[in-house]
Design a protein with these regions (language model features):
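Conserved ABC transporter NBD signature motif
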Residues: 2-15
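Conserved ABC ATPase "signature" region
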Residues: 41, 55-73
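Conserved ABC ATPase signature
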Residues: 77-81, 85
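Catalytic Walker B motif of ABC-type/P-loop ATPase nucleotide-binding domains
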Residues: 102-106
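H-loop/switch region of ABC-family ATPase nucleotide-binding domains
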Residues: 137-138
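H-loop (His-switch) and adjacent beta-strand-loop-beta switch element
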Residues: 150-163
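ABC ATPase nucleotide-binding domains
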Residues: 168-170, 174-197
Length: 197
């Protein structure tokens, strides 16, 4: 296969400053003694600004932290935060960068249900601001409720479309194999629950 990719009409190299990446929690060394404010300020590094810590940029950092609901934790060490709070810190960092596209890698892993709901509320608010949210996940539970559109990948694109329609049995077999009945029981509105009837 061959072709080209454009992001907002630009080549990926030119558009990379418009993309903010939120990594998996377990890929980060949390032993560094950094506060929430300091991590979010890292979003200013590399921006076209002569003074990254000007009053204007400091205000942008604080606004991003407020937007994700961490105002009271702004000076707290990040290694004392919960998994959901850590995800919110990195979302705030990408907002400070001015990213137009947010790419979240396994955003809901090691995060309890309540924290997942908080994250989805924040993500939906960001989406309303006109930003694009891409989330990589292996968890298909409640996928129709969380996402507008889904792309299913297994070495190639198995399916792409509306989240309420794309997860057919044929697509699930292509992604996970016909032997994996846990996934094959999934249909829109059915998350694998079985009461034995």
């Amino acid at each position: 296969a061959n072709g080209s990719i454009k992001i907002y009409g630009e080549n990926p190299e030119e558009a990379k400053k418009k993309i903010g990446y939120i990594p998996q929690k377990n890929l980060i060394n949390w032993n560094f003694p950094l506060t929430v404010r300091q991590v979010v300020e890292m979003g200013l590094i590399g921006k076209n600004t002569l003074n990254p810590f000007s009053k204007k940029n400091t205000q942008a950092v604080e606004e991003s932290i407020n937007q994700v609901g961490l105002k009271n934790e702004i000076d707290k060490n990040v290694n004392n935060l919960s998994g959901g709070q850590l995800q919110r810190v990195f979302i705030a960092r990408t907002l400070t960068q001015g990213s137009e596209i947010l790419l979240l890698d396994e955003a809901f892993s090691a995060v309890d249900v309540g924290a997942q709901e908080d994250l989805m509320e924040i993500i939906n608010d960001i989406k309303l601001d006109g930003k694009t949210i891409l989330i990589a996940t292996h968890d298909i539970n409640n996928i129709e409720e969380k996402f507008d559109e889904v792309i299913c990948l297994n070495r190639h694109c198995c399916a792409f479309g509306d989240s309420s329609e794309v997860l057919t049995q044929e697509v699930m077999e292509e992604m996970y194999g016909s032997h994996n009945s846990m996934f094959l029981n999934h249909t829109p509105g059915n998350h694998g629950d079985n009461d034995g009837s």
